[in-house]
């Protein structure tokens, strides 16, 4: 049995876990899904995927706090989860994993599973780090941020900020203290660093060498080699792009809006943001003269509607993006890869270092512009949109990048990597030596 623990506060992660679960089922594996809740459990329900709600359950407000905590992770004094929530989460996860005889757990941002997997003594696969992996730091590929994670450091030169972006994550211990305090209580292996919080015993690297700039051979051969920043069993495997392909139709009125191609149309899909930020971005796009289709997801934005602005809820972005001139998205890898796979240039608003990398990879290819959310006033948004629609090089670059992702079944390759890792563990039990945890007391 393979368990999947999506954090359903993230639309991209929920859809990613759903895709992996389906691919595992198609390969004859037994799968169970559990989550601590969130507004996107509806995606699982609408897909007919059974799941168990684990304690403590996160309501919409707690999910908002959690997402905000992810963005500020690493800032002095920030703590993602209180100790009682971590203890309760680990306890319920351990009970679930043992009850179902799970042999492996696949996670996104359900970070308490770093401890529950060790308590149960099973390997953990992680997909939430995307391309934010050690070879990126070691080769200096993490970019200078579009805005510093700490506003007081915005004045630093880009060269210094890039050095910090590559040097810092493996050396930052404070962001994982919220887990390691409980790991010490349980007598299980801690999470050594912020960088390790994006990795698993099997790390599903959801990109391709042509985009990330790290060869397949280098990725597969990478080992911690005693580096204290990483758990000793960490392994990396390219699986290719893995983004949402929600089995939803485009609503009829949105179809009609997209078919009316008299003027360029922009797609605004900023699910991990605030209504105020979405309104600001929409205003900037309108200043640039484009019509706007808004994927509002959980936000109430109907008052924005007029003949040139349409607001819908959750939309199948992989079907919408190929039909628009430009997209405006955050920096999550799912959204970025949807644009890249669609051949659609975009403006990205990265919230944190991993998202900075995602947007930078597209910008390096010539198909995207990054704007730090703190700096994204209406005028900057309008200038970026005008640049993309008036300079054909952006659209041409997007079409070139699209070819890198063509025909790759990321979910299928992720499922194959999970199955292969389990097979290796079964054949070489010593690979789990650091994962044997204590009994939960």
Segments and roles (model prediction):
Residues 207-326:
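Donor-nucleotide binding loops and adjacent catalytic segments primarily
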Residues 1, 200, 261-265:
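A short, charged/proline- and glycine-enriched loop
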Residues 6, 75-81, 97, 175-179, ...:
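Short, basic, glycine/proline-bearing loop/turn elements
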Residues 125-213, 219-232:
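Active-site-proximal region of nucleotide-activated glycan assembly enzymes
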Residues 1-157, 280, 285-286, 291-341, ...:
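Glycosyltransferase specificity loop/lid
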Residues 164, 168-171, 270, 387, ...:
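Generic alpha-helical structural element
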Residues 83, 87, 168-176, 194, ...:
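Generic detection of long, well-ordered alpha-helical segments
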């Amino acid at each position: 049995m393979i368990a999947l623990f999506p954090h359903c506060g993230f639309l991209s992660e929920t859809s990613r876990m759903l895709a992996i679960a389906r691919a595992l089922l198609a390969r004859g594996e037994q799968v169970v899904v559990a989550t601590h809740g969130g507004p996107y459990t509806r995606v699982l329900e609408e897909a007919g995927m059974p799941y168990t709600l684990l304690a403590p359950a996160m309501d919409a407000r707690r999910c908002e706090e959690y997402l905000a905590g992810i963005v500020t992770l690493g800032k002095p004094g920030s703590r993602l989860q209180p100790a009682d929530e971590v203890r309760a989460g680990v306890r319920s996860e351990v009970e679930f994993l043992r009850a179902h005889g799970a042999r492996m757990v696949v996670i996104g941002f359900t970070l308490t599973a770093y401890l529950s997997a060790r308590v149960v003594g099973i390997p953990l696969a992680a997909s939430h780090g995307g391309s934010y992996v050690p070879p990126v730091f070691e080769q200096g590929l993490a970019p200078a941020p579009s805005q510093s994670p700490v506003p007081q450091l915005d004045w630093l030169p880009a060269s210094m900020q890039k050095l910090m972006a590559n040097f810092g994550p493996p050396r930052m211990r404070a962001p994982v203290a919220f887990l390691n305090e409980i790991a010490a209580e349980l007598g299980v292996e801690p999470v050594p660093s912020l960088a390790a919080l994006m990795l698993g015993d099997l790390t599903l690297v959801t990109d391709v060498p042509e985009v990330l700039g790290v060869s397949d051979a280098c990725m597969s051969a990478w080992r911690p080699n005693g580096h204290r920043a990483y758990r000793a069993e960490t392994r990396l495997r390219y699986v290719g792009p893995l983004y949402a392909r929600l089995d939803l139709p485009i609503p009829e009125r949105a179809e009609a809006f997209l078919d009316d191609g008299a003027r360029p149309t922009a797609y605004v899909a900023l699910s991990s943001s605030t209504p105020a930020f979405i309104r600001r971005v929409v205003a900037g796009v309108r200043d640039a003269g484009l019509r706007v289709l808004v994927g509002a997801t959980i936000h109430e934005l109907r008052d924005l509607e007029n003949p040139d602005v349409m607001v819908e809820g959750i939309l199948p972005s992989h079907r919408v993006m190929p039909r628009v001139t430009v997209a405006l998205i955050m920096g999550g890898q799912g959204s970025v890869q949807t644009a890249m796979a669609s051949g659609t240039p975009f403006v990205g608003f990265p919230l944190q270092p991993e998202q900075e990398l995602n947007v930078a990879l597209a910008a390096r290819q010539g198909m995207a512009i990054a704007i730090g959310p703190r700096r994204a006033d209406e005028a900057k948004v309008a200038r970026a949109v005008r640049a993309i629609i008036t300079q054909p090089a952006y659209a041409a670059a997007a079409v070139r990048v699209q070819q890198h992702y063509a025909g790759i079944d990321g979910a299928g390759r992720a499922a194959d990597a999970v199955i292969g890792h389990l097979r290796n563990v079964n054949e070489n039990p010593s690979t789990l030596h650091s994962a044997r945890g204590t009994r939960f007391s």
